Amino acid sequence: MTDALLRCKELSKSYQDGGDQVTVLKDIDFALQAGEMVAVVGASGSGKSTLLHLLGGLDKPSSGQLFYKDQEMTPWKADKLAQWRNQNLGFVYQFHHLLPEFSALENVAMPQMIAGKSPTEAKQQAEQLLVRVGLEHRLSHRPAQLSGGERQRVAIARAFVNKPQVVLADEPTGNLDGEAAESIYQLMLELNQEMGTAFIVVTHDLQLAEQLQRVEVLKNGILHKEQG
């Protein structure tokens, strides 16, 4: 038994490229504790996003095991994985993936409605989070009417609306300038402290990564703890 919230054991991922087998990840062992913030860094194409997709149940490993609170998830079917993601995970990407025809409030409320909450209850929860991330004056604005930093704040609010245990963030500041990127990182740090949500943050920005509790380096398909 382990007290890890999310962990993997000897996780590997390979692809067929014509007649060749390309190995992206090799025997990854990783554990995330409740409330922990971990950065995963590495060169472009090193497999960082692939690792995040495997940990989030968005892709299947070629071999190895994935556990959530000591329950093995590797054999789960797609519908069970989808339900688990909706109840326990939040996702933030480099591109915000907001639905353009919906307002900020409607975008943030959507995961709540998918989880079965009434529209009224979902919008109340969404409004509280949008106020928390500093967008109380942007509730009715659509994504095209928001700045890049504001759109990413909406995406973060959406990731938190179902009170996830873990947020997986893939280059969450990749499309932002330095000042906006720093403000997004500070927001994630604050939410971690306030809500106890664990984070795995994939990033190429070493300066920002160093603000987190632990840095793991992915190189040649192998995950290494950064030596301080």
UniProtKB/Swiss-Prot annotation:
Membrane topology listed for this record: Peripheral membrane protein
GO biological process, alphabetically ordered: lipoprotein localization to outer membrane; protein localization to outer membrane
EC number: 7.6.2.-
Domain named ABC transporter: residues: 6-228
PANTHER family: IMPORT ATP-BINDING PROTEIN (PTHR24220), LIPOPROTEIN-RELEASING SYSTEM ATP-BINDING PROTEIN LOLD (PTHR24220:SF689)
Family: Belongs to the ABC transporter superfamily. Lipoprotein translocase (TC 3.A.1.125) family.
Keywords per UniProt: ATP-binding, Cell inner membrane, Cell membrane, Membrane, Nucleotide-binding, Translocase, Transport
The species this protein was found in: Idiomarina loihiensis (strain ATCC BAA-735 / DSM 15497 / L2-TR)
CDD domains: ABC_MJ0796_LolCDE_FtsE
A GO MF label: transmembrane transporter activity
The UniProt record lists the keyword rRNA processing: no
Protein name: Lipoprotein-releasing system ATP-binding protein LolD
Binding site for ATP: G42, A43, S44, G45, S46, G47, K48, S49
One cellular component (GO) term of this entry: plasma membrane
